[in-house]
Amino acid sequence: YTPRTLFPYTTLFRSRADASVPLVKLAVARSGDKGNHSNIGVIARDPAYLPWIAEALTPEVVVDWMRHVLDPIHGRVERWYLPGSHSLNLLLENALGGGGIASLRIDPQGKAFAQQLLEIPIAVPQHIADQLT
């Protein structure tokens, strides 16, 4: 079993991404805490959007977007594809300043992290962007 083999979408691109829309137009998301880590689930509003979402939401891109919450030394992002649900799971490690009652942050459980991620621009073909406006 290799999780990467369950995500065949990287070979499905047949059109060029020549427009950009915020992730919220393509997906819904929910976040919460796992100790000192935050979990963000991103679910495509349409299965056809998932390849574009996955192409854009690499761990490196999410680290750059969410750098303000990640521990500068130990913070990192892991990503998994969730087969059958047209979704991705992102784990932001060491993002909660200790988490729960140990954290001095305004959002110690990371409940607003999904809303922050939903603003990230996603490159899509123009015909998809036109459907969403």
Language-model features: locations:
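Metallocofactor- and cofactor-centric catalytic cores in central/energy metabolism, strongly enriched
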Residues: 13-133
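Single conserved hydrophobic/aromatic residue that forms the stacking wall/gate
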Residues: 1-11
